[in-house]
Amino acid sequence: MKLRIIAVLGTMAFAPALMPALASESTDPAIGDVSVFATVPAPGHPFGVAVDKNRIYISTSAGDFFASPATGGHLNSDGERVFAYDKRGNLVKTTVIATMPKSDMGLFGLALDGNPTATHNLYVADMNGRILRLALDRDAPAPELFAQVPPPYSGLGWHASMWNDLVFDGEGNLFMTDDKPRLWKVTPDGHASIWFEDSRIAGLFGFAGGPLGGRIDPSGEFLYFTITISGYFPGEAVVYRLPLVDHPSASDLQVVHRFPAPSGQIPPQAAGLAFAESGNIYVGLIGTNQIAVLDPAGNEIRRISSPLFDSPWGLAFMGQSLLVTNADIQEPGIPANWKVLKVFVGESGLALNRPRTSDEGDH
């Protein structure tokens, strides 16, 4: 779910003391240096990011109810995109994802499997309740439907179930965040079922603001996920975790970190997150336009700020830098801000699970 709280509650005074971080002029970058990695063409509004061996994949969500709820949001009839870039930020391929006319919701999470080149795939979360599978590194037809929300939520769009982010476990299952508020498990054959529900992970507005970003920790034993704007801790952004067991209970839910919502300021609004090898957790804050850094125990140890940030949404490691998508959540949008930014953080990312999903291509 995406939401500029200012668009819902009205204009609020907000003038945080941010320390801008721009790319260092020296050859050795400093922690927090920010530069432009790539420019995103229309329809813009980059959300998801995934880093492959020699490609960077970016998903878009130009359709956006939450850009301006009072007017019905930003409507998009031109489809969404998955853009492929090389490691230098050059656009090399574009895949069009068809959407409904005047769509008000698009794409977010991306996950790569570990299949060899002949059967390598990208899994794409459509926030209207689908997972699409896109064949990579070969000629292929349009993306195929891999999974969708089951009854009674099927066919009702994001109002009933919004699949935001997705991440593989070591067995090839996909775990999905849904801000209605639920967490889902999708088996390797595409069967989706609710894995966890609890009123404490609901967003402030009930139908919005709940689970958004999700990643598995270095131990492989916990799913960490963000709450954009909490109802249980009103206005705060929260990082929770759950053990990766078959049926987690309410007592299994653990608070990792709470981002306070100071009175008179736009709430922080957590979006995507990413783990470093060290166990540090990087969290995009789209309200304050910052990246927060938590240590493995959940204590905040740093904030990265830059005037280049505009709704820093998706996060993925490339070397010792984070790639960060500028979602540009506002109406009207600012095309000049449709960027993928590169943030030097001085440590490497945790390798994501990339299971084999097919035996084809073996020799």
Each predicted region: which residue ranges?
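A short helix->beta-strand "capping" segment at the edge of beta-propeller domains
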Residues: E25-A42
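Beta-propeller fold detector
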Residues: S35-A38, V92-A98, A142-P150, S193-S199, ...
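Beta-rich, blade/repeat-based domains predominating
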Residues: P41-N54, S68, T99-N121, P151-K180, ...
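Flexible "stalk/tail and boundary" regions
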Residues: D52-R55, Y85-D86, N90, D113-N121, ...
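Short, conserved, GDST-rich strand-edge loop motifs in beta-rich repeat architectures
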Residues: S59-D78, F225-G235, A327-W338
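Loop/turn residues immediately N-terminal
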Residues: G63, N128-R130, P181-R182, G287-Q290, ...
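A short loop-to-beta-strand structural motif that recurs across blades of beta-propeller domains
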Residues: P69-H74, D78-F83, R130-L132, R182-K185, ...
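Short loop/turn segments immediately following beta-strands, especially the blade-tip
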Residues: L134-D139, R241-S249, V345-L350
